[in-house]
Amino acid sequence: VYKRQDKDSPRYVSFEFLESSGKCFNEKISPVIVFVNESKEGIKKAISYFKKPILQFHGDESQDFCSSFNLPYIKAISMNEKDFQNKIIEFADAFAILLDSGGQKIRGGTGKTFDWKLIPKEIKNNLIIAGGLNSNNITSLIKSYKPYGVDLASGVESKPGKKDITELKHFLKIVDEI
């Protein structure tokens, strides 16, 4: 996963990094590139380095904008938004919907969970859950909601933007045993 977010984000990556990383992938691997309100030109440049990227949008992008690249995309929707259910319907063509606890100022990586009881049961898209996931709560989430995937950030980091390998291995071991 490459996070092409705002430059102040600890998870930000440059175009130069994307270009050098793109040389490591073939068409069998689909990297996910995360964008927050990036320009169409910036997205086109970022995806040009990869054969089969998946786009992940965490900003205020419209459905028309997200689908205009003719690539699979994931749309992040904050469960703190009043109209989150309408947003889920709006992005029905998305490869996946990512439900997160972020808001307008902090788009993700908050380390906070949202109330999982708010997850709509009738989502037709693949469902990815984010927000405060760690080795203490992942079993409950997966057993109760069976998401297509989970998105990790601060729950397995030793500091913002730096994954803790020991915690990540522990997390993956738990998931593997479910």
Whereabouts are the PLM-identified features?
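Short loop-to-alpha-helix "cap/lid" segments that border enzyme active sites
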Residues: 16-24, 49, 60-154, 158-178
